Regions:
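A short glycine-rich, Lys/Arg-flanked "PGG" loop and its adjoining helix->strand segment in the class I
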Residues: 125-137
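Conserved catalytic/acceptor-binding region of the Class I
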Residues: 138-202, 212-223
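A short acidic, Gly/Pro-enriched loop at the edge of an enzyme's catalytic core
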Residues: 100-111
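Class I SAM-dependent methyltransferase Rossmann-like catalytic core
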Residues: 2-33
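A short SAM/SAH-binding and catalytic strip from SAM-dependent methyltransferases
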Residues: 110-123
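Class I SAM-dependent methyltransferase SAM/SAH-binding core
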Residues: 47-102
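Conserved Class I S-adenosyl-L-methionine
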Residues: 57, 171, 186-260
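Conserved alpha-helix/loop element of class I SAM-dependent methyltransferases that forms part
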Residues: 26-46, 61
């Protein structure tokens, strides 16, 4: 949720990643399944929305629980929506939209879910305000997002090379709680969990980040290509952090629920 991330960069990055996204999105699937395990669909809820649906993994899970209720799948990147529609051509209403400016009616939804998407929104007050607008009274917002403990190893390795920001910055659970309260949400529930993923080489991690569209999108990132020498030095610094031959990356996941 870096305020410095430009929407056009997000749209372009995730649109380009759509075709190969599923092959590198194992973490996203694990987190999405845990999100629903923690905050399942209410049998009494109205229409359900998957905000930042990507290629539709969470959309499919929600569709299986919807019991004939309307399901909306929204994403800022049209190629992602097209990939989701190819999986779930019936029973879902697809909308290409910015999460901070939802083209939905007031109080028309019972629940909003979002899996590892809202961290790319620059304006938390606008995001939480518009989600609250489109939910009916008592409606639930439930989402998983990256926390500041994400990719700490990669941050530390790049810090040995230069002073630029090479890794996306994410806000804390405390900041999210404050922003939800300021927007009028109540009964907030935030749980932090750290996932670890392993790679044969640092280059494999970098390819995965690019494959899911989550490479460095900060506006204050270094402009121009990274040199081979810089990349070599970063890889050496990353490897020096590891106690054995494994390359490990940490991902802090914040599971958040609040009610209108």
């Amino acid at each position: 949720m870096s305020a410095a991330i430009a929407k056009r960069d997000i749209r372009r990055s995730f649109g380009a990643a759509a075709a190969g996204y599923d092959s590198v999105a194992a973490l996203q699937r694990r987190v999405g399944a845990e999100l629903l395990a923690r905050f399942d669909v209410s049998p009494a809820a109205g229409a359900i929305a998957d905000l930042g649906c990507g290629t539709g993994f969470l959309t499919g899970l929600l569709l299986g629980r919807a019991a004939d209720r309307p399901v909306y799948a929204l994403d800022i990147a049209l190629p992602m929506l097209q990939a989701a529609r190819a999986k779930w051509p019936a029973g879902v209403r697809y909308v290409c939209a910015d999460a901070e400016r939802l083209p939905l009616a007031d109080a028309g939804l019972g629940q909003i879910y979002s899996n590892l998407a809202l961290q790319w929104c620059a304006d938390l007050p606008a995001l939480f305000g518009d989600c609250r607008r489109v939910l009916a009274p008592g409606g639930q917002l439930a989402f998983a997002t990256f926390g500041p403990g994400t990719l700490v190893e990669l941050k530390a390795a790049w810090a040995e090379v230069d002073d630029y920001r090479h890794v996306n910055a994410f806000v804390s659970g405390a900041e999210i709680r404050d922003q939800l309260a300021a927007a009028g949400w109540h009964d907030g529930d935030i749980v932090s969990r750290t996932y670890s993923t392993e790679y044969a080489a640092v280059a494999d991690l970098m390819r995965e980040l690019k494959g899911i569209g989550a490479h460095n999108l900060n506006a204050d990132r270094k402009r121009g290509p990274t040199t081979r020498l810089q990349l070599r030095d970063m890889i050496a610094a990353y490897q020096a952090l590891m106690p054995d031959a494994r390359i490990v990356a940490s991902w802090e996941i914040l599971f958040v629920r609040a009610f209108r």
